[in-house]
Amino acid sequence: MQTITFGLIATSDRASSGVYADEGIPALKNWLGSAVKNPIRFVEALIPDEQAEIEAVLRRMADDEGCDAVFTTGGTGPALRDITPEATLAVIDKEMPGFGEQMRQISLYYVPTAILSRQTAGIRGRCLIVN
């Protein structure tokens, strides 16, 4: 079976500065490990909520690291520093709005504040990027 390469990016000012441990990347690794039967290679980044840095890491993972898909955690809410969707939209070739719509719909069953999420997704080259 072909190895699938997943990029995992956690955007958080506090976790990236060591205030608390990131839980997003371990949760994604656990979920992907149980959902995907192919061998998996992970490329990881824990970075602050800085649009230029998020854009650079998304480009690196899609263009240089050969990621088949990149998943981000954090930075999709309405707070001023939540800019992950803007960074994603800046680097993708095609937007895939159905991903965000579906994730919000499912999340609303569990968390009423899911409606505040600005999740998006898109394609860069041959890489799917999902917030």
Feature map (PLM): residue ranges:
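Non-catalytic beta/alpha edge segments that cap or flank active sites
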Residues: 1-131
